[in-house]
A protein has these predicted regions:
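N-terminal phosphate-binding loop and flanking beta/alpha elements of the actin-like ATPase fold
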Residues: 1-56, 61-183
Length: 183
């Protein structure tokens, strides 16, 4: 179907791109994450209500809720089995890959549920993949952006390290999709 030029009287022209969604930039880091937008040609970090731009990449799974960031850190002292940090290291990794990491992981691997190659961790009675845990971090960042911008955020550009292989990149995309973000 052909699209025709729309001509309006002066002062009656609709705002261009008024219905477009905003795309955000996300640095999903191993230790900390942040979310930003481009404002007047420069990046602007979206800060939380606490004024902080950085969000620790830490997730606590409590009985009734998921807590992300600085609020999850205190749980680490009292109930470390409920907290996950540095999950990015396991993105796109299979069960066999864990053997190459050396040392013991601070998490219990759910061996029964990990069949088929995808790592599943047993955290606070839940069986979670690194993708699901990363999605919780991305969801918290998305919520921060929506509060700061007072609009829905559905699109994002997410940075990944150069060493990420195709599996880790795909896992990051899957996490974004679970969080409601199109990459």
């Amino acid at each position: 179907m052909a699209e025709f030029l729309q001509i309006h009287e002066p002062g009656e022209t609709p705002m261009p791109h008024a219905d477009d969604n905003v795309a955000v930039g996300i640095d999903l880091g191993t230790t900390n994450s942040l979310i930003a937008i481009a404002h007047e040609g420069a990046p602007e970090i979206l800060r939380g209500t606490d004024g902080r731009g950085m969000v620790p990449s830490v997730v606590a799974y409590l009985d009734d809720k998921v807590v992300v960031g600085a609020d999850a850190r205190p749980v680490l002292l009292d109930e470390p089995e409920r907290v996950v940090a540095s999950i990015k290291r396991l993105m796109g990794r299979g069960v066999e890959d864990l053997k190459t990491l050396g040392g013991k992981l601070p998490y219990d691997v759910d061996e029964a549920a990990s069949e088929g190659g995808m790592v599943r961790l047993s955290i606070a009675g839940r069986s979670l993949t690194p993708v699901e845990i990363s999605a919780d971090i991305l969801r918290a960042l998305k919520n921060r952006a929506e509060e700061a911008l007072d609009r829905n955020v559905e699109k994002a550009v997410i940075t990944v390290p150069a060493y990420f292989d195709d599996a880790a990149r795909a896992a990051t995309k899957d996490a974004a999709k679970l969080a409601g973000l199109e990459t």
